[in-house]
Amino acid sequence: MRDVADVANVSVSAVSLVVRNKAGVADETRQRVWDAISKLGYSVSDAQEEVRSPGVGLLIERGSMPAMLDIFYGEVVRGFQSEAQRLGYQVHLHMFDRHAETSSALRTKLASEANGIVVANDGDITPEMIMQLEELNVPLVLAESYVAGRRLPCVLGDNFTAGYSVMEHLLAAGHRSIAILQGPRKYSSLNDRLKGCLAAAASAGLLIPPHFMPSPHSENPRKGYVQMKELLEADQRPTAVVAISDKTAFGAMEAIKEAGLRIPDDIAIVSIDDVSESAYTNPPLTSFHIPRSEIGVLAMQKLHRLISGETEVPVKSLVYGELIVRESSAQKLY
């Protein structure tokens, strides 16, 4: 109903919300839409029959899909999708495969089907690609990613604080021999978590040696298991480990038990994400809770305001989390 949107001087998505009697539109805007429908000679039933839900694109790298569906990003997506449906949008999920698709083809596809785009996570979706998406002049919001030096609206978990908090927790328990199972550097969220860990260690005068920070094995689905095995095979064994994500921690815990060691008596372990499985590991995993569903909801709300033509100052929004202490780090050293 582009003609109604033009007469009412609103977005097509606003017309859709009004006709479908959805929330998210101011009373004054709602009245303008109905006035335009009347002026153009449409009946209510005509308008409801003709209007189609506006589309929003959700873009994520294909490599993230197993983790997205099983652990972390499933909740981000569910939050985004439920809020999109509440606001009257149809979600077009697009998984970018860098081996099978060019960034040019991606831009063409998204421009044809979406009134706005949310990019969830980064990784293979590089800063250069995001800047190219900006050139489409379509509302764009980032979730759990950002581009340094670009004032793009984004919604993030408080990843630096998460890293700082889990490391500080181990330091407060008396640990000084602490390893970090880091993640791939192409993810800004994981980089911020690592920076937080190192900042907390530096504040305590602790330097993490390189051999206590094994590199991730990007192509191996059991990254945490492989990294922990590498640590356990070294001459010196840490008394505690920070895993950069719960998925990494699950693999690390398996390797520790396989080596005949006890958690936390021989090695304490903490992590970041606090997915539902974390409370049911043996022992239950200490983890910093990232409000994943809320990130998706807030990203969609921000995108809706942009699509609706509202003035939106581009800000980097951080969603607060909290440390959930469980038995995996319970032992104190004296």
What is each residue range found by the language model?
Residues 11, 43, 115, 176-178, ...:
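Short acidic/polar active-site loop segments enriched in Thr and Asp
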Residues 1-52, 333:
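N-terminal helix-turn-helix DNA-binding module of bacterial transcription factors
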Residues 14-16, 50-68, 177-184:
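Short beta-strand segments enriched in small/hydrophobic residues
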Residues 28, 62-75, 93-102, 123, ...:
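Hinge/beta->alpha junction and helix N-cap segments in small-molecule ligand-binding domains
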Residues 53-168, 172, 231-233, 247:
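Alpha-helical recognition/docking segments in bacterial nutrient-uptake
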Residues 225-334:
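Flexible loop/turn connectors
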